[in-house]
Amino acid sequence: MNVCVIGLGSMGKRRIRLLKQFFHELKIIGIDNNLERMKSVSTEYKVDCYLALSEFGEKADCAFVCTSPQFHASIIKECLERNLHVFSEINLIDKLYDENIRLAEQKGKTLFLSSTPLYKDEIQLIRSKVKQNGRPCAYQYHVGQYLPDWHPWDKLDKFFISNKSTNGCRELLAIELPWIQSVFGRIKAVKTTKTNLTDLKIDFYDTFLIQIEHETGAVGNLAVDVVSRQAVRRLEIFNEELYIRWNGTPNSLYEKDIISKQLKQIPAGTYIHESGYSEAINEYAYLKEIENFFEAIEGKEALYSFEEDKEILKIID
């Protein structure tokens, strides 16, 4: 199978790294219109790279779209028109969603959307325990990191997280809300307080405090920011018979034993960490969603869809 990775920034490199490490039968091609980046990735990962998909003479079978989100829509459309199965990183805007969904159906191709937390063992365990408990619960969740620390090697004004339509808080919400809805039930209502706490030259709010009501009766407080100088993911879930705590990593998931009154660690699967990233970034979850993409090509249902994401983006808007 010929696999094109389009966009050779941090996410494109991650996908290439995992594809080379765990899927040895694939031929991997890199695509990036930045000549310097294209050459660098070709040298570092020993893959053929091109400036445009049209330069790749052989027929590709699928594409990973890993560019900045504002460019996804047109690239996805081109890939589908070329009869490629498509894996897309999160989009943040729903441009061409309906058109690309219809095009994928017409072409008989898989249109797959990343939602990495859904593939984390911790999230799947949390979901299982909340469902098993069977009662409405409350939760508090804080996720944030100071915006310039996301990619310190990039100039902030050149990075899509500083763009109003694809900003850092919007990305965090697009990452977190799908699993929150999966665990606690369909979102019924939200109330939001938003403000700016930094002196960063940005044209969007840097802090959101959100109260969420779910159709199941669950309620939550969600704090999302690009202010916190400590990268943080901190979750507490509770009701009369349940208490769960998680700090974003596989070894930080705890549940209170109601009988013994002791907090007990819950083993939460495999942890693969890449140097230079927050400890909350588990490469294993990225690997699992790549596997799900290839399974979806063979007919298995994906964990997340463009249709579901369209609804999440409406909530964010």
Give, region by region, the residue ranges found by the protein language model.
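Predominantly a Rossmann-like dinucleotide-binding segment in NAD(P)-dependent oxidoreductases
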Residues: 117-193, 198-201
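C-terminal helix-rich "cap/oligomerization" subdomain common to oxidoreductases
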Residues: 62-65, 109, 215, 280, ...
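N-terminal Rossmann-like dinucleotide-binding module
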Residues: 1-44
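Conserved acidic residues
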Residues: 28, 61, 137
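Short acidic low-complexity segments
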Residues: 46-59
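Glycine-rich, N-terminal phosphate-binding loop of Rossmann-like dinucleotide-binding domains
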Residues: 66-67, 143
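Beta-strand-loop-alpha-helix segment that lines the small-molecule cofactor/substrate pocket
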Residues: 62, 69, 73-118
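Contiguous beta-strand/loop segments that form the cofactor/metal-binding neighborhood of enzyme cores
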Residues: 172-252, 287-300
